[in-house]
Each structure stands twice: as structure tokens, then as C-alpha cells.
């Protein structure tokens, strides 16, 4: 089906705007995935703050031109589904990884984060990044552990001095 030039320009502009504000991008091949499964993926993507779109490769190359995601151009072969994470860098990777577990034909091609190309076999690195809240919680537990250890040490020193004084 032929797309009019105005429609192509609108698609390129829309994807370019999404790419400019995105933290990371993940590219996948969704051949053989049912419509109902894709609808479910899109719903989950909206809830996770991820922009998902099926775009022709030539339009996608034009859309990411001049952005940090232009390094993904080599991955734009065959049917391409692209997802941009807007709120958390690992959101799109986590979403696609979970979706791929239930879909045999869904294949993650590559990802990009912070100007770096991430191969499909290394997608776990991006998918397992903690969210901001998780990172803060981990930091707080480390700080809390260190302060409680300091308090126990000071109490032990106090008890030792009291024992030697008596």
C-alpha cells in the first residue's frame, strides 16, 4: 500500500520527536506475532511510558538521523518495530524481553542507550537497569547498613571501656 508523501513526512516527524526525547530505543522483528498480542504489547507500552511504532525502514532511518539512535541504522532490516523509552532507560528493553518470552517469533534485533549500540544478546544489561526508585532504595539500604554498623561498633567500644574501667 502506497503512502502519500505528506503522510510519510508526518510519520518521520512523529518518530523524530519521539527519538529526541527518548532515553533509549529497542528494535525488534514482530513477524508472525498475532494482532491481539501486538495490541496487548501496545497497551503495556502505554502503561510503561514507552512509545511503540511499526515503521518502514527508510522512514525510520530518516527519523533517527541526527539523533543518538542513528547507530541503529544497521538493525533496520526486515519488518521493524521500534520502541522508545521516555521515563526509564530500561523500560522498552524490559517490555520487549518479557513479551518475547511468550512469543516464539518475536525477535529483538538491537538497542541503543546513551549513544551506545547494544546487541540483541546483551539486551539484559539494559533490561535489568534499576528504576530511579529502586536505585534510591538500594542506596538508602547501603547507607542504613553502614550507619547501623558504625553504631554497633561505637556501642562495643563503649562497653569495652566500661568493662576495663570496672
Curated annotation (Swiss-Prot):
Alphabetical list of SUPFAM superfamilies matching this protein: Ribosomal protein L10-like (SSF160369)
Assigned keywords, A-Z: Ribonucleoprotein, Ribosomal protein, RNA-binding, rRNA-binding
GO biological process: translation
Record's keyword annotation contains Iron: no
Domain of life of the native organism: Bacteria
Keyword rRNA-binding: yes
Pfam family, one: Ribosomal_L10
Any one Gene Ontology cellular component term annotated for this protein: large ribosomal subunit
Family according to the record: Belongs to the universal ribosomal protein uL10 family.
Its biological purpose: Forms part of the ribosomal stalk, playing a central role in the interaction of the ribosome with GTP-bound translation factors.
Protein name per UniProt: Large ribosomal subunit protein uL10
Gene name of the record: rplJ
Amino acid at each position: 500500500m502506497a503512502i502519500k508523501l505528506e503522510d510519510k513526512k508526518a510519520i518521520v516527524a512523529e518518530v523524530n520527536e519521539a527519538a529526541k526525547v527518548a532515553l533509549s530505543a529497542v528494535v525488534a522483528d514482530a513477524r508472525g506475532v498475532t494482532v491481539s498480542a501486538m495490541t496487548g504489547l501496545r497497551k503495556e507500552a502505554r502503561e510503561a511510558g514507552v512509545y511503540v511504532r511499526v515503521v518502514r525502514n527508510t522512514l525510520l532511518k530518516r527519523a533517527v538521523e541526527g539523533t543518538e539512535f542513528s547507530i541503529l541504522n544497521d538493525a533496520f532490516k526486515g519488518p521493524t518495530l521500534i520502541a522508545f523509552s521516555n521515563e526509564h532507560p530500561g523500560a522498552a528493553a524490559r517490555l520487549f524481553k518479557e513479551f518475547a518470552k511468550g512469543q516464539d517469533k518475536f525477535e529483538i534485533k538491537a538497542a541503543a542507550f546513551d549513544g551506545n549500540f547494544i546487541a540483541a544478546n546483551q539486551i539484559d544489561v539494559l533490561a535489568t537497569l534499576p528504576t530511579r526508585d529502586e536505585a534510591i532504595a538500594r542506596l538508602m539500604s547501603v547507607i542504613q547498613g553502614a550507619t547501623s554498623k558504625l553504631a554497633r561498633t561505637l556501642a562495643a567500644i563503649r562497653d569495652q571501656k566500661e568493662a576495663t574501667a570496672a
